[in-house]
Amino acid sequence: MTATPFWSQIAAQAKADGRPFFTMAPMEAVSNTVFRQVISHAAAPDTFFSEFVYAKSITNPNTKFPVHGRLYVAAAESQKPVVQLWGNEAADFASATAELRDRGFEAVDINMGCPDGTVIKNHGGSDLIRNPQWAEDVIAAAKTSGLAVSAKTRLGYSKVAEYHDWIATLLSQDVAVLTVHLRTKQEMSKVPAHFEVVDDLIKMRDAIAPETLLQINGDVADYQAGVALAKAHPGLDGIMIGRGVFANPFAFESHPQSHDLHELLGLLNMQLDLFDDFATRYDVPRFPSLKRFFKIYARPELGATDLRNTMMDAKSTDDVRKILAAYQVKMRVTNHS
């Protein structure tokens, strides 16, 4: 079955603009509809990835890793995200991708790099690096749906040098996009990304699978850094940004501007409203999961440390709104005194 032109269209538009394409990384409890809409409002990438979705759960709601709203796409979103699937059973990927196709999704990405212990114990994520036959089987199964199939992985499990064989194996599967996080599973995010191997990855792609788009992830802070990286490494197609959005929700801004605390708190208020709307549809996520986002908006360099600390004691979104309202009144009084 012929795959959809999802990725080729994204890459072609970026190339016409003289830049790499940009995506926001799949992140657990982060890249759901709520945060995707916030980032889209601030500065959108070319496309988004969903949270991690257990492949079996899409057609079997009784699994231990249920979907719980991970596939929900709000009407306000301009496009459906790439669904990131994890697991190791080919049959699960065949049935999951067929169901996703019927729901109107165009692309799936297979997680082959997550270092989480629970995921690995259940034979997903970076466990596929140690079991390349599983990787080959799930890619082949996903392709039967006709969706665009990509994969996201790391350089290796324990050693950087593993990429010579591992990345070659994945490139041989003819995926639409191969995203490489420039660290090993063992390194997590504790060491700098291995940018020294990027040119070698490009050479491997050109030799083995010239039609596969190569995307890099790891230590790329923003749009400008991504453009510079692509210029330094001709042949690099895409840039994925993950943790960079926690340092700057405007990370995908092509022409960087200054953003004051008022604007950042406006994004937070937007996220609170979207969170409440999502909570009326699903029983997750719980309010405490929101607290990880406060540091994005109440930034120390903007004098908002006390505000952030106060919000961390909140018990609900309404509590946060009251704290923000009181803070803004205080700021107006201070500015006019």
Question: What kind of region is each of these model predictions?
Answer:
Residues 2-12, 27-99:
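Glycine-rich, positively charged N-terminal anion/phosphate-binding segment
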Residues 27-29, 53-55, 86-88, 113-115, ...:
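Active-site beta-loop-alpha junctions enriched in small/polar residues
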